[in-house]
A protein has these predicted regions:
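Catalytic cores of nucleotide-sugar-dependent glycosyltransferases that transfer UDP/GDP/TDP-activated
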Residues: 1-416
Length: 416
């Protein structure tokens, strides 16, 4: 059949069978494939660039593989369900709808193309949503093909779901389709430390944060310092990184602050490796040199124009000895070999005293949920799906989480 696959086991709990699909053989057939989708579904692929073409072809190839698997490995009595996540896999759903309609197709979106565009471009999403015309927005942000695939998949699916009530509202407006079901996100609690391990892991994570802070500054920090963090993708406004930094600036100006605060921004960005002065100080803490960069663990590309660094400067967070709040930017993936921490993210998370995720656009929000799983108190907002879920299911204050009300235009209030 010309399908190129590799079959193995996914290295997660349960070790499920996984099929890796190579879609590259379909690149030369892309015009015929997209023409067929236009004729059957009016899917508008004409303006799609490679960031549309490649995922669409992957989805198509995945649909072909599912068709082949069902034909050769299932009986007529078996009920087969294929679940497609996000617009990037939607072409597979469309292929199966016509080629093998007996397969039940679920389409799950974890955000919307237009919602992410609006929020990411500093436009008011929630207060103005009903005034936005989806077709005009798609043209404005040059995402006509992505929007078309997302909308078409939602309408053609046998069951359309999303991860939160707040995203269900987006779907109804931008995709002109009510979801059939809201399926809140979650995870198997198999990667959190056991009761016996927790104390040791927390101590190791905390010690690492203190060591790195001292190595960056070239001077000691308080042993009882409050360690605070934010993490996630580098979406400056959507993830509330701007609000986090503003809050640290306000906290630093609070004369009543009695404890030193070490604030870590764990957000991957372009960088050129670990800061050598920092590494020297980690190796030889008693011969510490004063770093030329008091914020960064790694050499950040274009630091002068970086939004995080510019916001830190604007808040006059200088990391001087007099400052009660010290803020650090870790622009590296924390997978155990970043060159500075050399510990996986979760082994560091457990060492924090508090996390804060003051999100503006967050269809669900795993990060505060992960914090709770690791027994770290957390802060989120009512614009995060998880935050809304907590508000709905807990009528009283929860000891581990604070959900701050957030809406369009109130970033300064949220920071306060």
């Amino acid at each position: 059949e010309g399908l190129r696959i590799k079959v193995g086991r996914w290295n997660v709990a349960g070790k499920p069978i996984v099929i890796l699909v190579d879609f590259s053989t379909f690149i030369t057939q892309k015009d015929e494939i997209f023409a067929s989708f236009w004729e059957k579904y009016k899917l508008d692929s004409i303006s799609g660039q490679w960031d549309y073409i490649e995922p669409a072809l992957f989805g198509y190839a995945a649909g072909k593989v599912i068709e082949s698997f069902v034909r050769f490995n299932s009986s007529i009595r078996q009920r087969i369900i294929a679940q497609f996540h996000e617009w990037m896999t939607g072409a597979g759903l469309l292929y199966l709808k016509s080629a093998m309609p007996q397969v039940g197709c679920v389409f799950t979106t974890h955000a919307t193309v237009l919602g992410r565009c609006v929020a990411g471009n500093n436009l008011p999403l929630y207060s103005e949503m009903k005034n936005y015309v989806p077709e005009e927005l798609a043209r404005r942000f040059n995402v006509i093909s992505k929007q078309s695939l997302e909308k078409t998949a939602a309408h053609q699916a046998d069951c359309f779901t999303t991860v939160s009530e707040i995203t269900a509202t987006e779907c109804a407006h931008f995709l002109d389709k009510e979801v059939d079901l809201v399926t809140p996100n979650g995870f198997e609690n198999v990667f959190t430390p056991s009761e016996a391990e927790w104390e040791g892991k927390r101590k190791a994570g905390r010690e690492k944060f203190l060591q790195v802070a001292q190595a960056i500054l070239g001077r000691p920090v308080a042993e009882d310092a409050l360690i605070l963090g934010i993490s996630g993708r580098y979406e400056f406004k959507n993830k509330g990184i701007d609000v986090f930094i503003d809050a640290m600036g306000q906290l630093n100006r609070n004369n009543g602050l009695g404890k030193e605060v070490l604030a870590f921004i764990l957000v991957p960005a372009g960088h050129a490796g670990a800061n050598k002065e920092l590494l020297h100080n980690l190796e030889l803490p008693y011969q510490a040199v004063t770093s030329t960069d008091l914020y960064l663990t790694h050499y950040l590309n274009d630091s002068a124009n970086d939004p995080v660094m510019n916001r830190i400067r604007a808040q006059k967070l200088r990391n001087s000895e007099e400052d009660k709040v010290k803020i650090f930017f870790v622009p590296s993936y924390l997978n155990g070999d970043d060159g500075v921490f050399n510990m996986p993210y979760y082994d560091l998370l457990v060492g924090m005293d508090l996390t804060a995720f003051p999100s503006y656009y967050e269809p669900w929000g795993y990060t505060p949920l992960e914090s709770l799983a690791f027994k770290v108190p957390t802060i989120t907002t009512t614009l995060a799906g998880f935050g809304l879920w907590v508000k709905e299911h807990y009528n009283m204050n929860h000891p581990g989480i604070e959900v701050i009300h957030r809406e369009d235009g109130d970033a300064s209030n949220v920071a306060t």
